[in-house]
Amino acid sequence: MSDEQRNGPPPAPPPEPGDASVPEGLVSAVLNLVNTGPVLLGAYTIAELTAVDAIVDFLEARPSDEVLAEAVRSLAARQLLVAGSSEEQVQVRGDLGITVAFQRRARKVLDARTTGTEPGEPWRILLLPQPEGICLMIRIDALGVHQIGLHKLDEALRTLIDWLPGGRVAKPDPAMDADAVLTASERSALVTVTDYTAQGSAEVAGASRDLILARNDGRLHVLSRDPRDRAELVPTGAEDREDVEERLAGLLT
């Protein structure tokens, strides 16, 4: 057994002045719950998440100060945001506090965006893997509502794969016009995994890698960026659905 397994997960970093803090022991307690099944953490707007620093900075445009102020008032009225131990801090409570804690622990994010979705479907899914083999999953709908939950990583990946475009994998064709395939596709998706670092409460994007899926006439085209020219898309050589799933999982390693 490793030291981490004996001693529990590493504590969340201490909050910066003006940050929202989360109760001690919260992370380890929730980890035990996730091992028994998904832990659903509620739905929030981007302004509410930004107000408590619960969103990766480079993924979203920052709402206006007026919108953020209204979000703070809304959270305070619901007792999700209360005074902290000093005048410079506030404490995030309830499920939103859990979201903050696990967002801060992540150091990479999978961002999947899909076209051709149906009413009631999310158009975007974020996965923020954790060291213990679980992840924070955020489903974003057309209204910008963020449905958040904690899941085992393998289960979250299965959910993601079921949501992404499917079909019989097309044979790689070097002469294929990628732009034409994407334009004519019934459903397409861009999956980007970005590593990042934290500087205080701010996240700074690092290296990233992409996988592009496009379903056209029942065939699934699997593309990636050409390493010689990242503006160009080329077939990946994926042979079947299992190969696609392995490539998606490989983006996170």
Q: Which residues make up each language-model segment?
A:
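Intrinsic-disorder-associated interaction segments
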Residues: E16-P23, H146-L153, G237, R241
